[in-house]
From Swiss-Prot:
Protein name in the entry: Cyclo(L-tyrosyl-L-tyrosyl) synthase
Effect on the protein of changing E233A: Complete loss of cYY-forming activity
Binding site for substrate: N91, Y229, I230, C231, A232, E233, Y253
Species, as recorded: Mycobacterium tuberculosis (strain ATCC 25618 / H37Rv)
Annotated site, Could be involved in aa-tRNA binding, chain positions: K139, Y229
Family, as annotated: Belongs to the CDPS family.
Function: Involved in the biosynthesis of mycocyclosin. It uses activated amino acids in the form of aminoacyl-tRNAs (aa-tRNAs) as substrates to catalyze the ATP-independent formation of cyclodipeptides which are intermediates in diketopiperazine (DKP) biosynthetic pathways. Catalyzes the formation of cyclo(L-Tyr-L-Tyr) (cYY) from L-tyrosyl-tRNA(Tyr). Can incorporate various nonpolar residues, such as L-phenylalanine, L-leucine, L-tyrosine and L-methionine, and to a much lesser extent L-alanine, into cyclodipeptides. Cyclodipeptides synthesized by Rv2275 always contain L-tyrosine.
Annotated site location: Could have a critical role in the catalytic mechanism: N91, E233
InterPro entries assigned to the protein according to its UniProt record, in alphabetical order: CDPS, CDPS_sf
Gene3D superfamilies recorded: Cyclodipeptide synthase
Catalytic activity: 2 L-tyrosyl-tRNA(Tyr) = cyclo(L-tyrosyl-L-tyrosyl) + 2 tRNA(Tyr)
Source taxon at top rank: Bacteria
E.C. numbers: 2.3.2.21
Note: The reaction proceeds following a ping-pong mechanism forming a covalent intermediate between an active site Ser-88 and the L-phenylalanine residue.
Length: 289
């Protein structure tokens, strides 16, 4: 795989609140912002990872504010080869109009755009959080079907031939060799990489703190389901160019990825490939959530 340790001075990482725990906000819908959705807090330093010197400014484009995570991410954004727009099922943020607007933004600024929606470990997540197996399956099918229909409508309207705008479920990548290698390597690293394990465990704890009462506490099953969810999505944060065969790619979401500070930090360890970027894309006039 082509993801490597960053050279000093090449990748610059701002901070989010991953290592600065605080009370988590209440979830606003069934899947909230997904397990890998997070928040960004530039006011608190992070002692685990070395920070950079300058964070790119947000740019207004087609009704959105685009905030590349690092200077290298800004270059990838400017190159405009490819973008992944992540969509989580059961999240009211992704309305039909919002998806259409994101599709227009993507087509205006990138040669190719892929909407990627989560359809793996969804039912397991609902069941782990208390639904019966039957109810969890019903809820997952309903939410996945709904988000797929909305994205498909957008793609058919904006690019009927599918030449530049596509929709892909996460499950599609399970037969992709590059994805499988990235996923297998990630599982191996979780056993030995202290930083990676700490970041993922903290992410799991933060997510479950919004779902499980403080007196009840999270179970081992709940923690494992969350970890599986994270590991399923992480390869796209590491090296989408290797997975989809594009020169470079910008992973876009309306929140900062909690893994981003580690993936774009200086030094050794698990890092995103040099042609993999991340940007926070929010409706114009709203802060990065």
């Amino acid at each position: 795989m082509s993801y490597v340790a960053a050279e000093p001075g090449v990748l610059i990482s701002p901070t989010d609140d991953l290592q600065s725990p605080r009370s988590a906000p209440a979830a606003h819908d069934e899947n909230a912002d997904g397990i890998t959705g997070g928040t960004r807090d530039d006011s608190a330093p992070n002692s685990r990872f070395q920070l950079g010197r300058r964070i790119p400014e947000a740019t207004a484009q087609e009704g959105f504010l685009v905030r590349p995570f690092t200077q290298q991410c800004q270059i990838i954004h400017t190159e405009g080869d490819h973008a992944v727009i992540g969509v989580s099922p059961g999240n009211s943020y992704f309305s039909r109009q919002r998806l259409r607007d994101l599709g227009l933004w993507g087509l205006t600024n990138f040669d190719r755009v892929d909407f990627v929606y989560t359809d793996v470990h969804v039912a397991e997540s609902y069941e782990a959080l208390g639904d019966s197996a039957i109810e969890a399956r019903r809820k997952a099918v309903k939410n996945i079907r709904g988000v797929r229909a909305k994205i498909t409508t957008t793609v058919n309207e904006l690019d009927p031939a599918g030449a530049r705008l596509c929709v892909r479920p996460m499950s599609e990548f399970q037969s992709n060799e590059a994805y499988r290698e990235l996923h297998a390597d990630l599982l191996t690293r979780l056993k030995d990489d202290e930083d990676l394990r700490a970041v993922c465990q903290d992410l799991v704890r933060r997510f479950l703190s919004t779902k499980v009462g403080p007196r009840q506490g999270a179970t081992a099953t709940q923690e494992q389901v969350c970890m599986d969810y994270i590991c399923a999505e992480a390869p796209l944060f590491l090296d989408t160019p290797a997975i989809l065969g594009v020169p470079s790619s910008l992973n876009c979401y309306h929140q900062s990825l909690p893994l981003a500070e580690m993936l774009y930090a200086r030094g050794s360890g698990l890092r995103a490939s040099r042609n993999q970027g991340h940007a926070i894309v929010t409706p114009d006039g709203s802060p990065a959530e």
